[in-house]
Amino acid sequence: MILFQYDFKIEFYGASSDIRYQKPKLVVETKQGAPIINIVISNEYSLASSLQCKKARLQLFNMPLNFNKSLKQGDIARIYYKKFAHEGDLDYRFIMIGYLGAPVDFDFENGDFICQYEVYLLSSDTFFDKKLDTKNYIGRSIEEAINLAFPGQAIIGMSSQDRKQIISESFYASTLREFIEKLIGKYVHLIFVDVGELDFKVDAKFVFINFDRPVGQRVYKRLEDFALLFIPQREVRFVGKSTINFWNATLFFTDKIKVGDGVEFIDRHGGVIRAIVQEIGASLSNVGDCTLKLRLYDESNILWMG
């Protein structure tokens, strides 16, 4: 049974750094289950697993035969949703904006025809070959180094101690790729490329997360407030001498939870579990349920080194 009737609006624009004054090439808006649209949001590893990047896959069913001719690789897709069919245009909420990959078409024996597109936050892998203005980071704090390499794009989810750590050994990087490779693992546990708050351009934010120390006065969002579908399931990993707990949670889709957020929930024994969102995925459809899947890193984990 579908509890919410989600609708979607997808606007397609020509490639541009700023689309606020552009008229979309095409607009696809669902009403009463037509056209059928499936959206899958997932995480893609890049730079040899050094960082995760949010991406989406669009599937549009039975569009006009010339639909793909109006779109090309590198065009921009802007995606919105609303939960109830009776809501107006002003009730649409922003999901993400990104660059289209090459279109893929599928024909099925029953006559259905699907146009499929990948939607990326970064224009291409060459993004990481961008030359840095500052190349030598010895003597700078981790926070200062990150903000120099990613001006206006960094969200730092690290403790004050980790932020203030001074780089005291060789740290020379001429490109973003080299910077990330030197940073990840040694100074930062996870770098996640997420969508920003802006909807008039492709606004990628780089989220830097460390798991082993508390981050100041973290605000915890109660998962029960977001229509949690079942009690999160624990997953145990063994890393060296450490036992690491993760939790997998599924809830109705919301745009209010992001990677790096603190969340809490009641486990099956009545205890309060606090965790950090490590990964997010979503399955969205205007003819089915829309769910958000979270992978959570338990804050009680203790990493034993050596």
PLM feature segments, named:
Residues D107-F128, I156-R234:
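Short beta-strand-centered interaction patches in the first periplasmic/extracellular domains
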Residues I95, I114-Q116, K201, V272, ...:
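Short edge beta-strand segments in beta-sheet-rich domains
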Residues G74-I76, G139, G260:
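Glycine-centered loop/turn motifs
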Residues T134:
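Glycine-rich loop/hinge motif
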Residues M1-L122, F246, I276:
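Assembly/oligomerization scaffold segments
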Residues Y137-Q153, Y172-V188, I257:
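Polar, S/T/G-rich
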Residues E109-K131, G288-G306:
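Short solvent-exposed strand/turn elements
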Residues I41-K72, N210-G306:
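An acidic/polar, Gly/Ser/Thr-rich interaction patch typically located in mid-to-C-terminal regions
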